[in-house]
Amino acid sequence: QLKDLDSVDKKIQRCEKMAKTDPKAKVELEVLQKCKTHLEQGKSIRSLDLSKEDRTAIADSFLLTEKPVMYVANVDEASMHTGNKFSAMLVEMAKNEGAEVIVMCNNIEAQIAELEDPADKAVFMDEYQMKEPALNRLIQSAYKLLNLETYFTAGVQEVRSWTIEKGWKAPQAASVIHTDFEKGFIKAEVIAFEDFIKYKSEAACRDNGKLRIEGKEYLVKDGDVMHFRFNVLNSSNTYYSLLLFL
């Protein structure tokens, strides 16, 4: 907050000179003054009620406390499910910022991470009445906060996950594997995650009509299992095509 307050003060000084003749600078100055008052009260900019236009006006100020955050409360084993008075205080504070709080016991999480056998992990978590490691919730919340999602490519040798931004279309999603996949994108074979889990294999999904052919406008969904077809011109002026199976 102190860093942002310093940045806002400097920006206000510049805008005051420009605001006399520049309407945009005048708008920015008004928003910056709101931000200064808010920061002086010990509050973060992300908790300030600003319109989309207001936030656009101060976008180039790159204020740290405007960025969304997530809090992680490390508690003891006895408090891992219910939290304690300290994590409750954190939750209350986070409400004002619209932020999420993940309550977890790092000691337990470390022990889970050391167990390589899935059966051993299941037994260990059952002893602590855990359905899944808290680390899973942490990762999922971080992805949500950063507006990210995952799709998969599944082949005989391995299954791989790829991270993309929400709202990306199939060609953009393909580009994280290789830029040629976006340039020469033809189509994508898509299986929904739930269908892949239910039918266990690509062949079974195909037999049950759960494999779809999607084009360039397809919006990739979180968990999609995808194969890409593309066609590009190489340096020898010849075409090569590929159906990706990783």
Task: Please provide the spans of the model-predicted regions.
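Hydrophobic alpha-helical signal peptides and transmembrane signal-/tail-anchor segments
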Residues: 238-246
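C-terminal-of-GTPase-core extension/linker across diverse P-loop GTPases
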Residues: 14-219, 226, 231-233
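Conserved phosphoryl-transfer catalytic core
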Residues: 5-9
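Intrinsic-disorder/low-complexity regions
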Residues: 223, 236-239
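Conserved P-loop NTPase nucleotide-binding/switch module
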Residues: 1
